[in-house]
Design a protein with these regions (language model features):
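An N-terminal assembly and electron-transfer interface module characteristic of large anaerobic redox
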Residues: 1-158
């Protein structure tokens, strides 16, 4: 049986459990990090332990499917609210690149999500400042894009 390593974007069943279940009747054994090192909402996953998990599993893997949001920031929501330095994030990426060089036979399917701009004053999955400023920040981005793409109405330009 071929080993497929899965580093999902977060702990939700649609990302952590369902891909695993889909592969049960396939030629692949899917291995995932333990839930205790995965993210939970705004709480980042343990990036050091996630990298250690990848290092341990890649030696015998056929392929790796990994979320760069999880690898670099500890998860989807943590990628929106992190305070990690550039150097910290770059070091995580470099460590994965070292694994990639060590195991060139392992196919890597990496993905990331484009940052969204929530249009509500809700900081449940956003930085704390989003509660008072979310809609206004969304509107500013919307109007800037509209001005560039199609132009603003006089009311919008006021």
């Amino acid at each position: 049986m071929k080993k497929l390593v899965l580093l999902p974007i977060d702990e939700r069943p649609c990302n952590y459990r369902f891909p695993y279940l889909l592969a049960l009747d396939s030629e692949y054994e899917v291995v995932r990090p333990p839930l205790e090192i995965m993210p939970h909402k705004k709480q980042a996953g343990d990036c050091a332990r996630l990298l250690a998990f990848l290092e341990e599993q890649m030696a015998t893997a056929k392929a790796v499917i990994l979320s760069l949001n999880t690898l670099l920031y500890g998860g989807l929501v943590p990628s929106r609210v992190h305070t990690d330095s550039y150097e910290t994030v770059a070091a995580r990426l470099e460590r994965f690149c070292e694994l990639r060089r060590r195991y060139p036979q392992v196919r890597v399917y990496a993905y990331t999500l484009i940052m969204r701009c929530n249009r509500a004053n809700n900081n449940e999955e956003e930085p704390d400042y989003w509660a008072p400023w979310g809609y206004r920040l969304f509107r500013l981005g919307y109007l800037a894009d509209k001005a560039e793409q199609a132009g603003l109405t006089p009311e919008e330009d006021a």
